């Protein structure tokens, strides 16, 4: 399995080193690239992201990555903002934008500000995740396992949801739409459970 071509898509706004290290610790070689040939010949792809949705989509556009990501046929895992970018639109405008941010549209989710009641934003720290039974991404991971989150926006629970988390209200912790997967938490910062999830993805 370690002979797979594993690629982290170089979005220009993501801190990829911790994701790269987490994959390498499992015995895989990793390439960071935005080259279409490298991306489309990969066996597994990661789409990490930090910052705002508007910033990230602008970076994808400037690097000609929007159509490229949509062409991917092998499993792709979006992490944190990378997962949110798989949705249709996001309310996370950044400071200057005054309308919804159009995202990649690879799943039906619309990213919204978390409704947390009296709980503070951002949602930061460890929280339990409840996965749908039988999804291979969570194989061998105990129900109610803890994962590490840092975010203020999320997708509501919908048909695309394969795992949920509760913070004031339920939100989507993981999605799947065909070959596109996404996790709102940071598996690379989530200890053994996170490592297991990355391994599960690499073994799909």
From Swiss-Prot:
Catalytic activity line of the entry: 5-[(5-phospho-1-deoxy-D-ribulos-1-ylimino)methylamino]-1-(5-phospho-beta-D-ribosyl)imidazole-4-carboxamide + L-glutamine = D-erythro-1-(imidazol-4-yl)glycerol 3-phosphate + 5-amino-1-(5-phospho-beta-D-ribosyl)imidazole-4-carboxamide + L-glutamate + H(+); L-glutamine + H2O = L-glutamate + NH4(+)
Q: Which GO terms describe its cellular component?
A: cytoplasm
- Where, per UniProt, does this protein localize? Cytoplasm
Q: Which GO terms describe its biological process?
A: L-histidine biosynthetic process
Instruction: Work out whether the entry's keyword set contains Hydrolase.
Output: yes
Q: Which UniProt keywords apply?
A: Amino-acid biosynthesis, Cytoplasm, Glutamine amidotransferase, Histidine biosynthesis, Hydrolase, Lyase
The record, for HAMAP family, names: HisH
Q: How does it assemble?
A: Heterodimer of HisH and HisF.
Function, as annotated, reads:
IGPS catalyzes the conversion of PRFAR and glutamine to IGP, AICAR and glutamate. The HisH subunit provides the glutamine amidotransferase activity that produces the ammonia necessary to HisF for the synthesis of IGP and AICAR.
Protein's UniProt name? Imidazole glycerol phosphate synthase subunit HisH 1
The organism encoding this protein is Vibrio vulnificus (strain YJ016)
